[in-house]
Amino acid sequence: MQILLLTILICSSFLFPSSSFASHIELRPCVEIAHCVREEWEENNIENPFEEIKTFIENTPRTEIVEVDGDYLHAEATSKWMKYVDDLEVSFQPESNILSIRSESRVGESDLGVNQKRVDLLKSKMF
């Protein structure tokens, strides 16, 4: 019985990739527009925009970077009162200077504009 359970556990670990968020270049589109924001723009004013935005995210309260892979970053932002977790992704394509940001709530239909405010704040720090 224990061998069967162990086999099932090991096999099920192959069903889901270790990072189900992005391809590390192109961020997924937002499916539910009410609680997801995805924007991208060309960034020519800052020498290393990915490092700049990474440093800003590292210093943002209640936000923890959980993965960095080259020019891709995945962070989790936790709300102050209800402790909801939102996923924040940043991808930079150095060959085209395109910086992409995606912020999505994990639960609920609406985020009351929190993800848009987060993306706007990150954009404002880049200009």
Over which residues does each language-model region extend?
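Ser/Thr-rich, low-complexity intrinsically disordered terminal regions
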Residues: 16-127
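Sec-dependent N-terminal signal peptides
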Residues: 4-13
